[in-house]
A protein has these predicted regions:
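A broadly conserved amphipathic alpha-helix scaffold signal in soluble, globular proteins
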Residues: 121-128, 148-151, 155, 217
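Glycine-rich, flexible loop motifs
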Residues: 2-50, 77-135, 227, 242
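Polyanion/phosphate-binding surface patch
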Residues: 49-51, 66, 253-254
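C-terminal auxiliary extensions adjacent to catalytic cores
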Residues: 2-23, 27-34, 38-41, 46, ...
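Short, low-complexity, polar/charged sequence segments that are solvent-exposed and flexible
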Residues: 72-75, 119, 212-214
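Cysteine-centered functional microenvironments
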Residues: 135-140, 317-321
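Conserved, non-catalytic sequence blocks in retroelement Pol enzymes and Pol-derived host proteins
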Residues: 112, 141-143, 373
Length: 467
């Protein structure tokens, strides 16, 4: 199966489909033409440009006022990629590196970057053959693009760096030899086009959004099972309540939980308690707020992954080469910090439901075992959940609240969006672990409601989980 790279907007769903189905990439004829046209325009300007063009005929960052001789322009780009590959820390997981490749290819395909067609094609070759550069998590300020990680992504193009291929980390030069590929000789601006961009941040955001939508759905299902196990009330989920406070996420969550619990004997039985704790009763408001946040962030990220984010931007039709700031990560740094909060809150409220289920209330035994004392039962899973939730709260300190000037003050405001991106992944993973612990507790607690049955949906989840 093949996905054609074109001007047709990518959606999060389409990206997920490409990755899950291991689709190959191919440039549309229109994209090929746009890339070639932009490169030819840039080449035509090299002889009579008449003025310095940042990163094309000059140095980089605070070295922007140093003019580079024409005979050194290719070496300039080669040196840029080498000098900026200064990442450190843990390596980025292969599935996110593959997303980085896809998003970089998409961004370059619009024909505003001035790269050679051969450069984009080699990136496609790498994607299609699962030859994934070794990229490190630390090093990007999220402005001037994701310089260090994108340098590591680009090193293999020039026959340098390391790649993961067939489960092994190997020198790119060795793999290139096996594949019969030649190293790319970068032309003017190409190194900058490869390094200036937000694909490190965007790839982490896309991965996190895919998981966030899945976990948001599971939070409703697991929360509904906990509500049943706790012998909770259905009235707080009635549509009338939410019509008078019409946040979409809230309305959708209430409707979802009503549907999940449809046909339950437990929810229909007479209740002796007047109301439930907030962690049960306010699921529509809390889960719903996270749904709304996910939807907002999704819209922003979909705009970003369909954008040209390098600098300078080349406009052949307008006869313009403009040095500007589309590399700056602020537009996605703020939403990624927001998504961390949204996912952390799903874990936060989940942990509170876990706590209630083991508290010996509403006919449930202490710690969900028949002989508490002799057995500690489900005591410690709640400790684990509390520890994870506490960690996520710390990770929710907004990375985008910080900025440290760099490059001798030329780059005097940065987004720190890459830090927002990497900690977002950790928060998402933490949330999944906490929801898994809640499911563990809810399934055990549900046993104590027998012989009453829950809904068909809950019983199906229960049976599959217990199996």
């Amino acid at each position: 199966m093949t996905h054609i790279i074109s001007n047709k907007p990518l959606t999060i769903e389409k990206v997920n489909e490409i990755i899950l189905n291991d689709k190959k990439l191919e440039l549309s004829k229109e994209s090929e033409a746009a890339i070639i046209k932009c490169r030819r325009f840039l080449d035509s300007k090299m002889g009579d440009i008449g003025r310095p063009v940042y990163g094309v005929t000059t140095g980089f960052g605070s070295l922007c006022n140093i003019t580079i001789p024409a005979e050194d322009l290719s070496q300039l780009q080669h040196n840029l990629v080498m000098s900026h590959a200064c990442g450190t820390g843990e390596t980025v997981r292969p599935e996110i590196v593959k997303l980085m490749l896809l998003l970089k290819i998409q961004s370059l395909s619009y024909g505003y970057s001035g790269v050679q067609l051969a450069t984009v094609q080699r990136l496609i070759d790498m994607f299609n053959n699962d030859i994934l550069p070794v990229v490190y998590q630390q090093g990007s300020l999220g402005a001037s693009g994701d310089l260090a990680p994108l340098a590591h992504l680009s090193l293999p193009l020039i026959g340098m760096g390391e790649v993961t291929y067939k489960g092994e980390i190997r020198a790119a030069a060795e793999v290139w030899k096996e594949m019969g590929w030649e190293a790319i000789t970068l032309q003017s601006k190409e190194g900058l086009a490869l390094l200036n961009g937000t694909q490190f941040m965007s790839a982490h955001a896309v991965w996190s959004l895919i998981q966030a939508e899945r976990l948001s759905d599971w939070a409703d299902k697991i929360g509904a099972m906990s509500l049943e196990a706790y012998d909770g009330r259905i009235e707080p989920f009635y549509p009338q309540v939410h019509e008078v406070r019409a946040h979409k996420g809230q309305i959708d969550t209430a409707a979802n939980i009503r549907k999940i619990l449809e046909g339950s004997e437990i929810i229909k039985q007479k209740k002796v308690h007047v109301q439930d704790p907030y962690s049960f009763r306010c699921m529509p408001q809390v889960h719903g707020a996270s749904k709304d946040a996910i939807a907002y962030v999704k819209g922003v990220i979909e705009t970003e992954i369909n954008s040209a984010t390098d600098n300078p931007t080349v406009f052949p039709d307008e006869d313009l080469i403009i040095s500007a700031g589309n590399f700056h990560g602020q537009p996605i740094a703020l939403p990624m910090d927001m998504l961390s909060l949204a996912m952390s809150e799903l874990a936060n409220i989940s942990e509170r439901r876990i706590y209630k289920l083991i508290s010996g209330q509403r006919g449930l035994p202490h710690f969900l075992v028949a002989k508490p004392g002799l057995n500690s039962g489900f005591m410690i899973p709640q400790y684990t959940a509390a520890s994870i939730v506490s960690q996520s709260k710390g990770l929710c300190m907004p990375a985008s609240a910080d900025s440290i000037p760099s490059s001798q003050g030329q780059e005097d405001h940065v987004s720190m969006g890459a830090n927002a991106a990497t900690k977002l992944v950790r928060v998402v993973e933490n949330t999944e672990r906490v929801l898994a612990i809640e499911l563990f507790n809810a399934a055990q607690a549900l046993e104590f409601r027998r012989p009453l049955k829950s809904s068909w949906t809950i019983e199906k989840i229960f049976a599959k989980y217990r199996k």
